[in-house]
Each structure stands twice: as C-alpha cells, then as structure tokens.
Amino acid sequence: MSKSTAEIRQAFLDFFHSKGHQVVASSSLVPHNDPTLLFTNAGMNQFKDVFLGLDKRNYSRATTSQRCVRAGGKHNDLENVGYTARHHTFFEMLGNFSFGDYFKHDAIQFAWELLTSEKWFALPKERLWVTVYESDDEAYEIWEKEVGIPRERIIRIGDNKGAPYASDNFWQMGDTGPCGPCTEIFYDHGDHIWGGPPGSPEEDGDRYIEIWNIVFMQFNRQADGTMEPLPKPSVDTGMGLERIAAVLQHVNSNYDIDLFRTLIQAVAKVTGATDLSNKSLRVIADHIRSCAFLIADGVMPSNENRGYVLRRIIRRAVRHGNMLGAKETFFYKLVGPLIDVMGSAGEDLKRQQAQVEQVLKTEEEQFARTLERGLALLDEELAKLSGDTLDGETAFRLYDTYGFPVDLTADVCRERNIKVDEAGFEAAMEEQRRRAREASGFGADYNAMIRVDSASEFKGYDHLELNGKVTALFVDGKAVDAINAGQEAVVVLDQTPFYAESGGQVGDKGELKGANFSFAVEDTQKYGQAIGHIGKLATGSLKVGDAVQADVDEARRARIRLNHSATHLMHAALRQVLGTHVSQKGSLVNDKVLRFDFSHNEAMKPEEIRAVEDLVNAQIRRNLPIETNIMDLEAAKAKGAMALFGEKYDERVRVLSMGDFSTELCGGTHASRTGDIGLFRIISESGTAAGVRRIEAVTGEGAIATVHADSDRLSEVAHLLKGDSNNLADKVRSVLERTRQLEKELQQLKEQAAAQESANLSSKAIDVNGVKLLVSELSGVEPKMLRTMVDDLKNQLGSTIIVLATVAEGKVSLIAGVSKDVTDRVKAGELIGMVAQQVGGKGGGRPDMAQAGGTDAAALPAALASVKGWVSAKLQ
C-alpha cells in the first residue's frame, strides 16, 4: 500500500532524525530579516545566516519540511499553476542540512538509503538517474564506485547557461559568497511517457523527473570570480514533497496525489463543479494552500508587496470559481478541508482557522462586487481588439477600477490566445508606485550592504554605560579603518549596552565617547551577530581598535521599557476581552508611543476599548514583578509563552513573565515591575487591513500628558459654554437643541423668501410661441433653493420653460424646468447642457428637470441671453 503525503513527510523527518539530525520546524513564509526575499522559497532560507557564518546553532545537522511560496519576484510560478503537472504557488520542501559536519559521501549515502531501502521509500534502483557538475569527480566516483550506479545513468552537466559556473548543477547564493556543485537525482517514469534524460534535447519531457537536489557548499566566491575553498564545507538539500509523493503513489502529476485529490473533491463540492478534470479545480486547490498559510503567517491582502501577491492569488482563485459556476462565496470554506489533509503540518493553521476564514471571506466578497463588471469590460475590449495583444492602459484600468491584477487579466486573455502588454501596464503603474514609496530614514540602508564577521555581546539588560572596543567601522557600506569628524558611519563594538532594533522595539540612541572624540548614536541595528551603532562622529577621530565608553540615552530607554512592558499587558488583555483568536501581527515600541497590530475582524466597541484599558491599569496597580527566564523553546511553548509575529527564535529563548497575567517570548528591555508603568491610555483604534486592527497607546508621563490635554479641552469647552465640567453634557445637549431649532426657523424663512421671490418672478415671464419663458439670474438665493422655486413657478405659469441661475463663491449653479406638455419639443437636459457649456460646466437630468454647474461666472449673462433664441428655434 502506498504511503499518504503526510506519511511521506513524517518518514523523511524520521529517517534523518535517526541519522542524528535535529528536526527543525518550518519557518514562516515571511522571511525573517531578509529584504532580498518576498517569501520563503527554499528550505535553506531559515539557515542562510548559518551558512554565511553570521549565526550559530547548537546542532550541526538539521532536517525540515519547509513551507514555501513561489508567486512573485524572480521565482514566480503563478501563471503556470493549474496548467502543468508540477507547478504550484505553495509547496513543501523536504531537506537535510549539514553545517560543517558531513559532506559529499554521507549526503549521497543518506539520500540513496532513504530512496531505495525497503524500510523507507523502496524505489527501484534501476529507475534512478543522477547528474553531477562536470568537474565534480568526487561526487561522480561516490555514485559510481560506492553506490554502484552504472556510468550510463550518471550524467555530467557543464556550464549550460552561458557563463563559468552558470549551470543547472552549480548553486550560488549570489555573485559572491558560498557556492558549490550539486548532484541531482531523477526518477524515470518509464518509456510510456515522452521525454529524455537530463542534458538531452528531450529533457523537458515528463519521463525523467528531478526529485532531489543535493548542494555541496564548498567554495566562497570572491568578487574577482576566484573560488576559495571553505574551511568547513556544508550540505543543503531539497526534495519537493509533492513530487516524491507522486512517484511513491505511482501517479504522473502532482495533482493526482492523495492530498490534491482530496482538495479537488472539496473544491468541486463548494463550487458545484462536476467535471473533476477541469483545470480550474487544480488552480483553486493549489491557491487555497498558499493563501491560507500566508494569512496564518501574518500576510494580509493589500495593494503593496506581499499583500498584493496574496490578493492576486485570492482573486485568481475566485475568478476560477466563477468559471466553475460558484454562485456564492466559496473559497474560505476550503480552509477546513485543507487543515484535515495537511495532518501535523496544519496545526499552526488550525489555531488560526477562524481568522484565516474571515480574511478570505471578506476579500472574496469585496472582489465579487466588481468581478462581473470587470469581466464584462474585458470582454468588450477583447471584442474590439484587432491584433493579438491587449494594451497596457486597458490592463491598468481593469486593475485600478475593478481590482483586476494584471496576471488575472493575462489569465483570461491566455484562454483566447491573446497576450497582454505588461510593459505598458508597468509604465501606467509607475506613478502610483512612486507615490507609495517611503523615505528610507536615517542615512543609507546599511543593513542591506554591511556584512560583519565579528560578533558583539549585548549587555544592555544590566548596564546603560559600558566600556568597549571598536571591532569594525563602515562608511557607505564599506569597511574602513578610521573615520573623522563629520562622517556618518556604523560603529561595531565587541560589547555594548545599546539595544539593536528587534521584536518591534526601536534601537537605542546615545553616545560613544573617549578623551578626544564624540560619536552621536542615532540608531542601533543588528548585522548578523554584530551590533552596529549608526550615527555621526561629532568631534575628533575614531579608528578600529580604539576603546570607547558607550552611554545609552537613559531617559529615552526608560520610556521605551515602559511602553514595551505595557505592550505585553495589552496583548494579554486583548485576548481576555476579545478572545484567544487575537494574535500579534506587528508592533512598534519607541519612547513616545506603542503601536500594536493584531488579528480581529471588526472595529472594537468603545466598551471593549475601555475594558482593555481598565484591565491593563489593574495589572499596573497590582505592581506585578516582571521576571525573565532562559529556557528551551519547547519548554517555553509548553508553559504557554506567546511568540511574537515575524520573530526567529533560537533553541534557548528568553521568557518574560508578568505575574500570572502575561507570558511571552521576548528579547526586549522592560520595566522591573508593572507598577513602574504608572498609567496606560489608549489614544486610537483603527483598521490597517482586512482582519487586522491597530491600537496606539501611551504610558507613564505620556499618558498623564494626555489626561491633562483632555482636561484642558474640557475646561475650554466649559468656559465657552459658560458652565463647568460637571454639567458639560447637559450644556452641549442644550446648545445643540437650540442650534437645531434655529436652523429649522432659518430654513422656514428661506422657503418663505423663495416663495415670495417666485411670485415676483412669475410676472417677468414672456410668451414664446404660446409657451411662457422665464430666464433669470438670482442673487442671495442658495443653490439648493432653486429646485423649490422652479416647482412653484411651474405651478403658477402652466405651460412653461424656466431657467434660473445663481452664483455663490465664484461657482455657477443652474436649473431648468419644463412643463410636461412641452417636453416633446424642449428637453430640460438639452437646454441646461447648452447653457452650462457656455459657463465652463456640464450637467443633465430628466426631460422636465435638469441641473448643472459651471466655473465661469462672467459668462453667465450672455449664456442666459442665448436661451430665448434656442427655445424659439425648438418651438417653431
């Protein structure tokens, strides 16, 4: 009996655990602290700093089943999903890793044992082919002489991409840095399927399928292209779970494995589809996986960056549901079946099921309102098309007006063999993107440029002043030996009391000083294991090796500590008041305010905000001790410690507890007791995205300042109303009632004046071919009274045509009224359009009543004078 996908995943992890590997949980789909990646797209992403030597783990062997998304940027599989056997937006990458431990021999032997042993995957050995890099004789000999694969099934692959080391069998992280050859294992499905072995002209067929890539990181590529051997070579491997499941379950398409068969049946059930071979079912089954897990990892639909990619995938799925005939919202209903089919890998998703479903439902409902109209517009444009390419401006209009991502438009066009001018679309988008860009802040983006080999020891939990030594200096991202007064730089110390930005808490400010220099620190950031002090040398000079005194801005740090501790209290209070579905989606803690983004599907009610505020202040009055303990990550989770969104944790973690009220994993700086916070005030609650709310709050002196400001405003209002704060509400109600009464009386007076004006005007009507024509410019009449006056005049004059105008604040207001017995000859809409055109405006309406506006008041007399001639011509 073949293994299920869940059993295959577990067997892989169990095998490598038996070989001394630490089983490491999948990291978030949002890469930690890596701006070069849109989404996690490989198993090695979470170990990148380990391979670069910037991070260390307490294990040298690891194995994972890593959730990955490829739907944006360089790795974008979106347009092929559903149309091929193996493309997905979401997939799981099985991997084993060696950090300077074993190398080629063991990596190859492990792979062969897992794939061919009767105890494990038991694949027929004769079905397996391998490739090696052309010059990697070591790997070739291991496969041939130790494993015993015949030479005809070992293929050397050279530089097949037009440059040295540019090969399918040579992996590199970038233009410089760790790199090395790789060996790939292929499975031969048999000669009943078209295709040739790797390296042959028919290699793109489906007969020979790559199932495992084993990368040997053995070189450090220099800027000049030279390859220096690494002192401790490493191994990074990746095997797509869906691909190996297809092989082990004896099917040729990933969409035929048990996991997808179950999901496709669920899609058919919620959409009403009956043809299980329909490609739209595949699209939706794939897309629910990426969408659900992205939302669970904190990504929300939006029009920027990761949120926009998520929105594109959701909307593509909704459109395919529409094609299948879905009559109501359906996509969110697939989260439950997905959790069931993912087994143990779906536990994180299950905890957030309600939140994920709500976000998907809201997004689908919003898009459904414009989908039909957008598709109709696209149909119209395609019907008019003379060539085979839809212009970029139309694609942009569909995006801008109807929320159609360009790839959804391309999807529709693809079904009709029409291309989309994506370059034209990008040009139309550029102005919007430019407006959306944010200023980068202080100086350059040092974090993207600086690579520090040294490590810094943080001692800021216990010290705000400390002596240290300069271990590195950077100017404009380049290492230098010394800096002089006036230069901006990043200073790295061997030890420091300065906290580097992390976990939502901003970096410290302060001063680095010595007998002959002073360096003003404006920010503190992490660079791998080093801590960089970003700022400007105010006086003197500073060089690598100098001793410095590092002084943190104590008052600022104190305010940050209060705000950070209050954030923990508020998080716990929100979960008590709103429910345990609340989880952190982002935070900012600085010296002025705390900002907290959390999952919740509706605006908080005033009484809920008050309840959270009261609960936090109650904990402050309890003056609970704030304690930290270092423990294993699993022990911390067992204790109920909440993890911060987007943070990466080591196996040993810092657990912060506030009595029995709050327990979280946190590396930030905090107050000693909750009583130190003094006072907590929420100053705003708002929405930031579908299913995400934001609270801003203040503490301590900041909270007291808001109390004083509120009191001052109340005193000012009381003074204006000649009352006091005790009876202020009654005073305001009284003033509002009096205002309403006066407004009512004023309106009555205006109506009386308009009626009188109408009576006076009726005598000025002239006869034009048996119809009474009245044209007049009025002064001192509100534009909204014109309609009432026209109705009165029509009643008085009988068979009539009326044009009234008034000017207020330089703007012209026009109205035309035509009695119904005349509308067959004169239509109010045409008449008002003729007049409005002359005063720089436009308007329209019914045949018997029409209104317009204009901007050229000076042209009004001539425009009104033209009415008589126009009407006379119509009445002849």
Curated annotation (Swiss-Prot):
Designated name of the protein: Alanine--tRNA ligase
Cofactor(s) annotated in UniProt: Zn(2+)
Chain's role: Catalyzes the attachment of alanine to tRNA(Ala) in a two-step reaction: alanine is first activated by ATP to form Ala-AMP and then transferred to the acceptor end of tRNA(Ala). Also edits incorrectly charged Ser-tRNA(Ala) and Gly-tRNA(Ala) via its editing domain.
SMART domains with a match to the protein in the record: tRNA_SAD
EC number: 6.1.1.7
GO cellular component, one term: cytosol
InterPro entries per UniProt: aa-tRNA-synth_II/BPL/LPL (IPR045864), Ala-tRNA-lgiase_IIc (IPR002318), Ala-tRNA-ligase_IIc_anticod-bd (IPR018162), Ala-tRNA-synth_IIc_core (IPR018165), Ala-tRNA-synth_IIc_N (IPR018164), Ala-tRNA_ligase (IPR050058), Ala_tRNA_ligase_euk/bac (IPR023033), DHHA1_dom (IPR003156)
Keyword annotations: Acetylation, Aminoacyl-tRNA synthetase, ATP-binding, Cytoplasm, Ligase, Metal-binding, Nucleotide-binding, Protein biosynthesis, RNA-binding, tRNA-binding, Zinc
Enzyme class: ligase
